[in-house]
Structure formats: structure tokens, C-alpha cells
Design a protein with these regions (language model features):
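C-terminal accessory regions of radical SAM enzymes
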Residues: 18, 130-133, 137-144, 330, ...
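Radical SAM [4Fe-4S] cluster-binding motif and immediate context
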Residues: 157-337, 343-346, 352
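Conserved beta-strand positions
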Residues: 52, 80, 237-239, 294, ...
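Short, solvent-exposed turn/loop segments enriched in Gly/Ser/Thr/Pro and often Arg
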Residues: 13, 84, 240-245, 270, ...
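Structural recognition of alpha->loop->beta junctions
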Residues: 91-109, 283-291, 349-364
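Acidic, low-complexity intrinsically disordered segments
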Residues: 1-222, 227-231, 463, 485, ...
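A short acidic, helix-capping loop that chelates divalent metal ions and anchors anionic groups
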Residues: 18-19, 301-306, 374
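A structural preference for short, hydrophobic beta-strand core positions in alpha/beta folds
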Residues: 9-11, 80, 267, 333, ...
Length: 556
């Protein structure tokens, strides 16, 4: 009750995960689990006001169902908010039976709303809220952006039920597999906003222009509090621009090192390549960094300019060179295909730059324009997409969302990749079907085939963890991950594990027509794990600076 308001939280996601992770003789249906929990909380607390937050478009239907049930249980006003709501608030309000929606950051605007309700301010001073009134939507757009002082507060962790147990049920981020075994994980935010203006990103829409940093002492005290009270040993930074302000960043990491908290961390949301200076990365490594992602998206200079990326190919190469000096940091790169007007040769540029960077993993996505972003408006204006808002958005959530989506697609034509590329015009924009093939080719060669040439013992151990996380967690039964983990098992003279992986791989292929089609195209087979013979071992990696059609693509 810091401001005289009594607040209680309920995390429906954690309740559902905890329920189904707990062994029991009989399980209730999914819907009953969260509905019973929500009903019990509302009836016990009897709130004057119910707020529901939704970050991801893919959970829109959950937002709608939770809102609807809340209205059935209580006659009190129900409001919604979060990134998803902000990005397309009019359409969301048309589909979700909420009384109002708070848009953008609600730290100050919600308190302003309370003051208006209490009669301390006139209604004309309402900010960042959309109110349903007799079938109409009244929108108050005045922006109240929290200052660095406003956000330099310790979160009210006491409102979160059993924070220390969260890691037992599910995972978060791209690098949880690299934390110490059984280490508990939490999230922390040091900065809000991003200096970049990437046209495909909604961060600037939500947070506004620029970056606001929390006081370093407050951030480190928060991490120390999590360690002391909840035994948290790994944090994932939620920042969209963690390396903003070089001196501030180095000071933050040095303070973490000085305090010797014994906490590791990762940056799953990506960092700006131009900000990856040696002193920053050295301080990051010393303070416990286990993994980070560079936001590259494209290796073509024209595309980079058009989407307003804050970096050049030179920046990407330099950042990769510096990261290779810190092998304990698992370094990934965000790549994206399918930008407006992006030709096949431009996609080759991305492939070639990524290959030359030679980092640990490449998270490849196909562009999905989000409402309220410049690229969405551009594509609508050019007739490339229809203005249907979130209704057609299919977020590729997590590091392997694209893979999971492809596996559900109709079977692609069974052709070798050499044939596919030979029949494409390098100066033409590929069809969506061809982009899918290009994606699969890039994923195999940038992430998997290169493992044949890996010799560094530190990197081999990290890649084994990555592969295990893929086929056990992020993309269950992923055939390529199983195949290459089997290769490492054979490399380490572990035929028992190789046989186990062989059986799992056979089962995965039996259930996936898609992968039964693609495995021969890559010249890989489960039998290789049994025979300890891997024909592609002798196939050279893609050379930087050359097009795939020019490569020695034996079986590919």
C-alpha cells in the first residue's frame, strides 16, 4: 500500500504450469484450472478494480477469455493493458469486453486515473487511457512518460506468490539452459526504451523516444534482494537496449562484479552491435554474462538503411570479432527474411555476413509486421498486406518459433536445395514458399552443419546444451538437433546415448512428413548415428562471400 492502494496479483500462467507439473492421479481440464483460481482470488479479495495485462499478440484469446470471466464474476470495472493492447487498442477493445484500456507505460497514467476517480483532478487530465462509454471509445492520448527517477524503484516482490519457485515450472529467455544446474531465475530491467528506430519494432511505439535508465544502485540492490530473499542465481535482462550509454553500462557491470553476488545473467532481447565495445564485453563477461544476442536482421546495406537499423555490416563484423574473444559467452544473432523488396541476392548477403561472423547460433525469423510499426504502415500503403491488425499476426515466439510453424506447413516440394536456388532469379523477390526453403537452408548451414567443424571444448559443451534444450524444450523432438547431438555422442565415444538419440530421431521422423522430406535433401539419416558414419562431415562449410548455388552442396 505504498500509495494507499491495496493491491494483489495473480499469475494465471504460473498457476497453470504449477498444476500440470505436479504429479496427481487425475488432472482437471486446462480451462477449469485457471478459471477456478481466478474466481477464488476475485471472490476472496473483492477488488474495486480488476486489471489484466497482456504482452503477446499470440495470447489475445486468453486475454479475451480472462476478461470475460472477470466480468462474469465481478461487477467491478475491468481494464486491460500491455504491449499487445497498446499496439492495436481499437481492434482489441472491439473484441475484448473490457471497460477501459491503459496504453503505453502505465506507471503515471494509472495513478492519474485514480486521482481523477477520487476527484482530485478533472477528467480532462486523464492520460493514456481508452474508456468504453455507451458503445463508444473515448481516447485520452496525453502522454505521461515516467522519468528515470520514477522508474528507479524496487519492484513490490512481496506481491508475487512464491517467486523462488517460478523456475521449477517452465523457463524464460534464450539462455536458461546455460545457467548453473538448478539455479533459480528471475528477470530484471535496467533501462526502458531503445535508441534505435527499427521500422519493424514496436518498442518505440510503447516506450516512446529514447532510453531512460534506472539508477545503478537501485538495479544492483534489486538483484542483491532477489539473491538474498529468493535465492535467485541467474537473471535475464528485459532491456531492449542494455548497452545504452557505454560508461553507465560498464559501471553497472563493474558494480555487479564488485558486489560479488554470485549471479549470472543473459541478454535475451538483443543488444546493438555498435555498442559492443571491448571494454563493455569484458565487463559483461567478468560480471557473469552467459549469453547475448546481437540484433543484425540483415546483411544487406540497402535493407539496413531502409529499416533504420543502428548498425552497419562493419559494426556486425567488429562485434563478432570481439565476442569471439569471450568463448564463455554464448553469442547469437537475430536474422530476418522477407522485408519489402528484399531480393534473393539480398538474402544471400545476410547469409554471407552471418557466416563470416562465425558466432554460436543464428535465430532466423520471417518478417511478421506488427500493427503500429512503420513497416506495417508501409506494407499496407504498398498493398503488400491488408490492414487487419493483430487478427493476422502469428508471432514466432521464442528462439525456435519459426521452426515450429514450418513443421505444421503443407509439405514443400521434395527438391534439392541446389535445384531450388538454381531456378531462382537472384534479383527477384522470392515467393513466400521459396523464402521458407531459404529459411530452412540457412538454418541448417548456419546452425547445424557448422557443428561438424567444431573443435573448441568449451563451445562443444555449450552447443550440446543448446541442442538438448531445442529437442527437449523449445522444439520438442527436433530432428536436426537430435541428429547432431547424436554426432557429438559418437564423437565422445558414447554409443549408448547415440542409440537413445537414434530411437528418438526415428520416432520424430515417423511423425513428421515435413522432416521425412527434408532429411534426404540435407543428406542426413538416423542410420548415421548407428553406423557412426557422417557423410556430411567432409562437406565444406559455406564460405563467406559466396552464394549457395556456387557451393559444393553434396546432397543439399
Amino acid at each position: 500500500m505504498r500509495r494507499g492502494l491495496q493491491v494483489e496479483l495473480i499469475n494465471l500462467n504460473d498457476i497453470v504450469l504449477k498444476y500440470f507439473f505436479t504429479p496427481r492421479d487425475k488432472y482437471l481440464p486446462f480451462e477449469e484450472v485457471w478459471q477456478d483460481a481466478l474466481r477464488a482470488k476475485i471472490e476472496e479479495f473483492q477488488p474495486d478494480f480488476i486489471g489484466i495485462s497482456c504482452m503477446f499478440t499470440m495470447t489475445h484469446q486468453s486475454l479475451a477469455r480472462v476478461t470475460d470471466l472477470s466480468r462474469q464474476i465481478s461487477r467491478r470495472p475491468v481494464c486491460i493493458g500491455g504491449v499487445h493492447v497498446t499496439n492495436d487498442v481499437k481492434r482489441v477493445m472491439e473484441d475484448v469486453p473490457a471497460d477501459m484500456a491503459f496504453i503505453y507505460e502505465g506507471d503515471l497514467s494509472f495513478l492519474r486515473f485514480i486521482e481523477v476517480v477520487e476527484g482530485k483532478r478533472p477528467a480532462s487530465e486523464l492520460s493514456q487511457v481508452v474508456i468504453r462509454d455507451d458503445g463508444e471509445l473515448l481516447r485520452f492520448d496525453n502522454r505521461l512518460v515516467p522519468s528515470p527517477d520514477d522508474i528507479s524503484l524496487m519492484p513490490a516482490f512481496e506481491l508475487v506468490a512464491d517467486l523462488s519457485a517460478y523456475t521449477q515450472h517452465g523457463s524464460i529467455g534464450a539462455f536458461s539452459q546455460f545457467k548453473r544446474e538448478k539455479a533459480r531465475l528471475a528477470t530484471v530491467l535496467a533501462n526502458r526504451g531503445c535508441r534505435a528506430q527499427c521500422t519493424f519494432c514496436s518498442v518505440r511505439t510503447f516506450n516512446g523516444v529514447g532510453v531512460r535508465g534506472k539508477a545503478i544502485g537501485v538495479v544492483v540492490d534489486e538483484i542483491a534482494y532477489l539473491k538474498e530473499h529468493y535465492e535467485i542465481e541467474h537473471i535475464m535482462w528485459l532491456d531492449d537496449d542494455l548497452f545504452y550509454d557505454e560508461r553507465h553500462t560498464i559501471h553497472l557491470f563493474n558494480e555487479l562484479t564488485r558486489r560479488n553476488l554470485g549471479v549470472t545473467w543473459d541478454a535475451s532481447n538483443g543488444v546493438i552491435a555498435a555498442a559492443c565495445k571491448e571494454e563493455v564485453l569484458a565487463a559483461a563477461a567478468a560480471s557473469g554474462c552467459t549469453g547475448l544476442i546481437i540484433g543484425m536482421e540483415s546483411g544487406n546495406p540497402k535493407i539496413l538503411r531502409e529499416v533504420k537499423k543502428p548498425g552497419t555490416v562493419k559494426h556486425f563484423m567488429r562485434a563478432a570479432e570481439l565476442l569471439r574473444r569471450h568463448p564463455q559467452i554464448y553469442s547469437c544473432v537475430f536474422l530476418m527474411l522477407g522485408f519489402p523488396g528484399e531480393t534473393l541476392s539480398m538474402m544471400y548477403d545476410t547469409l554471407n555476413v552471418a557466416r563470416e561472423m562465425d558466432l554460436d547460433w543464428y535465430k532466423i525469423a520471417i518478417l511478421q509486421p506488427l500493427p503500429s510499426t512503420p513497416i506495417y504502415d508501409q506494407m499496407v500503403a504498398e498493398g503488400l498486406i491488408e490492414d487487419v491488425g493483430f487478427l493476422e499476426v502469428r508471432l514466432e515466439l521464442g528462439a525456435f518459433g519459426k521452426q515450429n510453424e514450418l513443421y505444421r506447413q503443407p509439405l514443400l516440394a521434395s527438391r534439392s536445395f541446389k535445384e531450388i536456388f538454381a531456378n531462382l532469379d537472384p534479383n527477384a523477390v522470392p515467393s513466400r514458399r521459396d523464402v521458407d526453403n531459404i529459411w530452412v537452408y540457412m538454418d541448417y548451414h548456419l546452425n547445424y552443419h557448422r557443428l561438424f567443424s567444431l573443435t573448441d571444448s568449451i563451445k562443444i559443451q555449450l552447443q550440446k546444451r543448446m541442442l538438448e534444450n531445442i529437442y527437449n524444450v523449445t522444439s520438442a523432438g527436433h530432428p536436426l538437433a537430435l541428429y547432431f547431438r547424436g554426432y557429438f555422442a559418437r564423437l565422445e565415444n558414447d554409443p549408448v546415448l547415440a542409440e537413445i538419440l537414434y530411437e528418438r530421431l526415428k520416432k520424430s521422423l515417423d511423425s513428421s512428413e515435413y522432416w521425412r522430406d527434408k532429411f534426404p535433401a540435407f543428406n542426413v539419416s538416423p542410420q548415421h548415428l548407428r553406423d557412426n558414419v557422417f557423410p556430411n562431415f567432409k562437406v565444406p562449410r559455406i564460405r563467406a562471400g559466396s552464394l549457395p548455388v556456387d557451393e559444393l552442396l553434396v546432397g543439399c
